[in-house]
């Protein structure tokens, strides 16, 4: 899925749209993305006042370079995202998806906060004193690879016992429930199968 969000300088959402578009590294994917963005902005007045585009990506991004160092979800490694600026003719800023979600929170109100991202993989982000903490290698919120169960289940990264092997949506919905919503409902109902 791809989500388009138009946000004003007060961090208020002006417009939102989500479309189903399977990721691809093919040029046709980026052409379609550009078309969808133009369609999304078609009825927006003062488009010349748009300052830039933020793109959140599931993976580790090298700050300032637009290099996706690694993304398990997209199955990419050392992939340059820089060409997207030419695709959109606006400044483009890249950020990890969980970090983007953390920054979307009211960091003036929640000075110290933790965000957990539960998707195909387990991710997260946190802030201290209203500042996003990313760490030297941009992995500070990668909670999915903290060892939860020593010598436990094998994770896709090759290590044993990573939190991701137990807490990612795919792990929570394997044989027990068909969907994440069903799993959450089982938790609410305090069912032992959850």
Give the location of each predicted region.
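Activation segment
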Residues: 64-65, 72, 136, 166, ...
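Short, acidic, Ser/Thr-enriched surface-loop or helix-capping motifs
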Residues: 8, 63, 127
């Amino acid at each position: 899925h791809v989500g388009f969000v138009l946000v004003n300088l007060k961090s208020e959402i002006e417009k939102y749209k989500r479309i189903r578009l399977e990721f691809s590294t093919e040029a046709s994917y980026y052409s379609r993305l550009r078309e969808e963005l133009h369609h999304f902005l078609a009825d927006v007045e003062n488009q010349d006042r748009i300052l830039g585009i933020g793109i959140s990506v599931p993976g580790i991004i090298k700050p300032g370079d637009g290099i996706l160092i690694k993304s398990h979800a997209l199955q990419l490694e050392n992939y340059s995202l820089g060409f997207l600026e030419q695709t959109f003719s606006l400044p483009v800023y890249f950020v990890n998806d969980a970090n983007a979600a953390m920054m979307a929170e009211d960091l003036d109100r929640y000075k110290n906060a933790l965000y957990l991202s539960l998707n195909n993989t387990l991710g997260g982000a946190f802030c201290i004193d209203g500042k996003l903490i990313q760490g030297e290698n941009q992995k500070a919120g990668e909670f999915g690879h903290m060892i939860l169960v020593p010598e436990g289940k094998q994770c896709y990264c090759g290590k044993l016992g990573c939190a991701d092997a137990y807490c990612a949506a795919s792990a929570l919905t394997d044989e027990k429930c068909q969907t994440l919503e069903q799993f959450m409902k089982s938790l609410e109902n305090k069912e032992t199968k959850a």
